[in-house]
């Protein structure tokens, strides 16, 4: 076994299909050039997590010590560790150092990237890095603790990178975008929320709407298929229209908020071809599709209402081991 190993995974934006993907609709998701890096170092006592964003947390190794109350921040990591142990990796005391360029609880896939990068670095420290398939299964154990009912879209994109058409239970399909001359602007409302709370709320509204909600889900699925064609054909105007329609459907199931709508309408009035929430909603981030010449205007338009805004580049590479 090596003394330490390091791995990273990308964040993501869901272009269309969040929430609907939980119940089997299609989602289109892209990995972005912001990554989260995890260094695992053996030694010390139990498990210690150090992160500039999440603070310092420690816990006994699973199965050792009294059943102490574990910090909720560490619980998903412990679920990943248990899953690794079930696959034959020995459980040793270690420190997990998380360095991230992805804001947490903002809909950009920070928790999935951390589960994936942790599982990859821990397995690599044992000299046997997980395959992409196993990485998905192990990281999903952590995501279930963090998210409740994850569709798997966040973990899949963190493992694979690129742009994917994702439907729960099916093999994801790589998309070759044909879009040129456009940029995706990401603006953070600065409002943090837990994905599991929003997912539960949206599902409860869908259930309360009964049969009517099946039409909303069906429309979301058709919209995502249209988005896939528009992205492949390079039809940015049509993709923008689809993003706006997707925002309406998400809003109809209670995923939006005043902060999100403010950013959406600011972007649209600054010339966005389309703008919508990305990720779970309520807070977190909004994405806007801009012609390259107009993205500066878009950035200016959101300054007052967002905690941070940036243009997102697509990351071809998914999870990877890092030298250090
Ligand atoms: C969160 O990034 C996406 C959701 O659809 C939840 C999920 O798919 O697991 C809201």
Swiss-Prot record:
Q: Where does ATP bind?
A: 103-113
Query: What InterPro entries does the entry give?
Result: GHMP_kinase_C_dom, GHMP_kinase_C_sf, GHMP_kinase_N_dom, Mev_gal_kin, Mevalonate_kinase_arc, Ribosomal_Su5_D2-typ_SF, Ribsml_uS5_D2-typ_fold_subgr
Instruction: Cite the active-site annotation.
Output: 154
* GO biological process, alphabetically ordered: isopentenyl diphosphate biosynthetic process, mevalonate pathway
| An example Gene Ontology CC term for this record | cytosol
Does the UniProt entry include the keyword Endoplasmic reticulum?
no
The UniProt keywords, alphabetically, are:
ATP-binding, Cytoplasm, Isoprene biosynthesis, Kinase, Lipid biosynthesis, Lipid metabolism, Magnesium, Nucleotide-binding, Transferase
Q: Where in the cell is it found?
A: Cytoplasm
Q: In which pathway does it act?
A: Isoprenoid biosynthesis; isopentenyl diphosphate biosynthesis via mevalonate pathway; isopentenyl diphosphate from (R)-mevalonate: step 1/3
List the cofactors: Mg(2+)
Superkingdom of origin organism:
Archaea
Task: Enumerate the catalysed reactions.
Answer: (R)-mevalonate + ATP = (R)-5-phosphomevalonate + ADP + H(+)
> Which molecular function GO terms apply here?
ATP binding; magnesium ion binding; mevalonate kinase activity
Query: How is the subunit organization of this protein annotated in UniProt?
Result: Homodimer.
The protein here is known as Mevalonate kinase
Q: What is the scientific name of the source organism? A: Aeropyrum pernix (strain ATCC 700893 / DSM 11879 / JCM 9820 / NBRC 100138 / K1)
Q: What is the lineage of its organism?
A: Archaea, Thermoproteota, Thermoprotei, Desulfurococcales, Desulfurococcaceae
């Amino acid at each position: 076994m090596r003394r330490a190993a390091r791995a990273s995974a990308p964040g993501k934006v869901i272009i269309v299909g969040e929430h609907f993907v939980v119940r089997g609709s299609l989602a289109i998701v892209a990995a972005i050039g912001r990554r989260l890096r995890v260094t695992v170092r053996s030694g010390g006592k139990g498990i210690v997590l150090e992160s500039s964003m999440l603070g310092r947390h420690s816990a006994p190794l699973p199965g050792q010590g009294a059943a102490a109350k574990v910090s909720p921040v560490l619980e998903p990591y412990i679920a990943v560790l248990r899953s690794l142990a079930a696959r034959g990796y020995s459980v040793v005391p270690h420190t997990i150092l998380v360095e991230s360029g992805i804001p947490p609880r903002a809909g950009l896939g920070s928790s999935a990237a951390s589960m994936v990068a942790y599982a990859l670095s821990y397995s690599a420290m044992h000299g046997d890095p997980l395959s992409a398939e196993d990485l998905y299964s192990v990281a999903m154990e952590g995501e279930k603790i963090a998210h409740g009912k994850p569709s798997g879209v966040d973990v899949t994109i963190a493992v694979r990178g690129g742009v994917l058409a994702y439907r729960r239970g099916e093999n994801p399909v790589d998309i070759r975008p044909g879009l040129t001359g456009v940029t995706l602007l990401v603006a953070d409302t600065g409002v943090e929320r837990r994905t599991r709370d929003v997912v539960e709320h949206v599902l409860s509204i869908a259930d309360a709407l009964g049969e009517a909600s099946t039409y909303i889900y069906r429309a979301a699925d058709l919209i995502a298929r249209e988005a896939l064609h528009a992205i492949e054909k390079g039809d940015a105007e049509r993709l923008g229209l689809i993003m706006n329609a997707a925002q309406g459907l998400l809003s109809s199931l209670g995923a939006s908020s005043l902060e999100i709508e403010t950013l959406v309408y600011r972007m649209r009035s600054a010339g966005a071809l389309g703008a919508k929430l990305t990720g779970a909603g309520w807070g977190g981030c909004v994405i806007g599709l801009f012609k390259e010449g107009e993205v500066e205007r878009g950035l200016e338009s959101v300054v007052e209402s967002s905690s941070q805004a940036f243009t997102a580049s697509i990351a071809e590479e998914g999870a990877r081991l890092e030298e250090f």
